[in-house]
A protein has these predicted regions:
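Short, small-residue-biased leader/transition segments that mark boundaries at the very start
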Residues: 1-8
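Transmembrane alpha-helical segments and their short flanking loops
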Residues: 104, 115-127, 189-250
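Hydrophobic, small-residue-rich alpha-helical packing segments that form membrane-like cores
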Residues: 63-75, 79-148, 153-157
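Interfacial helix-loop-helix linkers and transmembrane-helix boundary segments
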Residues: 39, 84-91, 191-201
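Alpha-helical transmembrane segments of multi-pass membrane proteins, especially transporters
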Residues: 11-15, 26, 40-49, 93-101, ...
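Membrane-interfacial helix-loop connectors
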Residues: 17-18, 24-52, 58-67, 75-79, ...
Length: 250
């Protein structure tokens, strides 16, 4: 009996908590395959997952990764040195969230040596004039590592380092949102037609959104630049706002 309007906010919160839209979408595919969710309900959840996944990029923008190790330590302490079940569960959450942000920090740091490679810098500088190539790069990289949060974290690092301008970064961001749909597609391969429709709808949402944003790339870039100047956003937060705007509009 879950309505579309109920499904959307529930899934936004759920995705924000587990930090994985792909994980939520795979669960949805399984529930639809088992007949526990209708296609309409599933679409509402997928839409919510797309919005909920933007929370990670905002957390990176707030530099929460700087506190990853203390959070991991606190989570481990609650998990291994307390006998209270609620504290154990809280410890699992803190340990997992801290681990995610520690890993994202490591990936961001791994990009640092590339900033001194002239060929790499020159190639990235051309992407502002080749948005379709940016989409392909974003989609391909996200399909490869199965995490849009990770690729967007890398993108935030590249943009903050001045290796990409905003018009070059945005198509990669759009591609990341297409690439993240591969997990649902793979999960639906052995499922029934209803589950395949959910995966197809997920792909369709993000592809249509990307095509529209590419057509409107100049005004979309101007909008994000306006957010940046009016709100005084850091480069990382600028990408986070772009990610949020894309998924909410989508």
């Amino acid at each position: 009996t879950l309505s579309l309007h109920d499904a959307l906010p529930i899934c936004i919160v759920m995705t924000a908590l587990i930090q994985s839209s792909s994980g939520v979408t795979v669960i949805v595919v399984g529930l639809v395959s088992a007949g526990l969710l209708s296609l309409r309900q599933a679409i509402g959840i997928v839409m919510g997952a797309n919005i909920g996944t933007t929370v990670t990029s905002f957390m990176i923008g707030f530099k929460l990764g700087d506190y990853a190790l203390p959070v991991i330590f606190l989570g481990a302490a609650l998990l291994f040195f307390t006998s209270n079940k609620k504290l154990n569960n809280l410890g699992r959450i803190l340990f997992g969230v801290g681990g995610i942000f520690f890993a994202l920090n490591l990936m961001g740091d791994a990009v640092e040596p590339l900033k001194s490679v002239t060929a790499f810098k020159d190639y990235l500088a051309t992407l502002g004039n080749r948005p379709i190539m940016g989409v392909i790069i974003g989609a391909g990289l996200t399909m490869l590592i199965q995490s849009s949060a990770a690729t967007i974290g890398i993108l935030q690092s590249l943009y903050s380092g001045g290796l990409l301008d905003l018009q070059g970064a945005l198509p990669i961001l759009f591609g990341d949102n297409i690439g993240t749909t591969i997990t649902a597609v793979l999960a639906a391969l052995g499922s029934n037609i209803a589950a395949k429709r959910v995966a197809g709808a997920h792909v369709l949402f993000n592809v249509i959104g990307t095509v529209l944003c590419l057509i409107l790339l100049v005004p979309f870039t101007a909008l994000i630049q306006w957010f940046k100047s009016v709100l005084g956003l850091t480069p990382e937060m600028t990408i986070a706002f772009a990610h949020g705007t894309f998924n909410i509009a989508n």
